[in-house]
Amino acid sequence: MKLTGKQTWVFEHPIFVNSAGTAAGPKEKDGPLGSLFDKTYDEMHCNQKSWEMAERQLMEDAVNVALQKNNLTKDDIDLLLAGDLLNQNVTANYVARHLKIPFLCMFGACSTSMETVAVASALVDGGFAKRALAATSSHNATAERQFRYPTEYGGQKPDTATSTVTGSGAVVISQTPGDIQITSATVGKVSDLGITDPFDMGSAMAPAAADTIKQHFKDLNRTADDYDLILTGDLSGVGSPIVKDILKEDGYPVGTKHDDCGLLIYTPDQQVFAGGSGCACSAVVTYSHIFKQLREGKLNRVFVVATGALLSPTMIQQKETIPTIAHGVVFERAGGAS
């Protein structure tokens, strides 16, 4: 791996996604991508006795599917990189307890999907792991209880709010050739433009996404024309227009090349306010829908920029603003991009 420009890692060895697993809840199952998820549930408890245990079940499902697709067992994995939204990364920690794989716990809020993939790819490229597993998850009810109001409270929300995706995604990464190659990653910087409203994460995260996309273009001397798709994680209906406006004003227009996972996972009639959000939003959309399009040749090169609001309820109560970050990874159809 070599650092190119200021923030972009270009992998010196071919790094591949060997398999991916996704698990999702009932609302995600009923959405436009529902048929693409490997495992789905008809109710939010996922056959468990608490929301937190349900989220844990989702991550275990995604991990198990990713391993099974590649005819692997947990003993074939050298390193697990995982994280979630809950305090102390409790979902990832308990899944790691069960798997007993060497474990790096990671937190980047909703940017964790691409953060884990980027670091896993770097470690595989550097020879520190032959085969790594990257996973993340979120659950609507656990996130609401921790960051906003418990679902039982019935608090009203503004139109700028998003709906946290209930689901999990996991990928196996190695130098073993596969259909999808990971060629580079751009590590984001923390941005904070003074947003304090926990019900408007799209506006808060858009500047971080724009900053990472601009830096990626600068570092690799590229433009949006070099990509079939530039996909943000969960800016949804509020943040997506903002990031396009920022990039256009700064001379890096993305136009119709841009889309957002939070706009793809649900339909407007599903009562999701501005769209989807959460760690699982970018993970389940990318690891199912986007990977399928890459394998089928409908896409050749995609830049996935997972966006995260580093939101702390404690700091918000102390009148602090919300810092945000975005990490990006380039996925290419093996042999398909020039």
From Swiss-Prot:
User: GO biological process: what's one of them?
Assistant: sporulation resulting in formation of a cellular spore
Does the entry feature the keyword Protease, yes or no? no
What one GO molecular function would you report for this record? acyltransferase activity
The domain of life for this entry's organism is Bacteria
Among its keywords, does the record have Protein transport? Answer: no
Gene3D superfamilies linked to this entry: Stage V sporulation protein AD
Q: Which SUPFAM superfamilies match?
A: Thiolase-like
Identify the keywords attached in UniProt to this record, alphabetized.
Answer: Sporulation
| A Gene Ontology cellular-component term | spore wall
What name appears for this protein in its UniProt entry?
Stage V sporulation protein AD
Species assigned in the record:
Bacillus subtilis (strain 168)
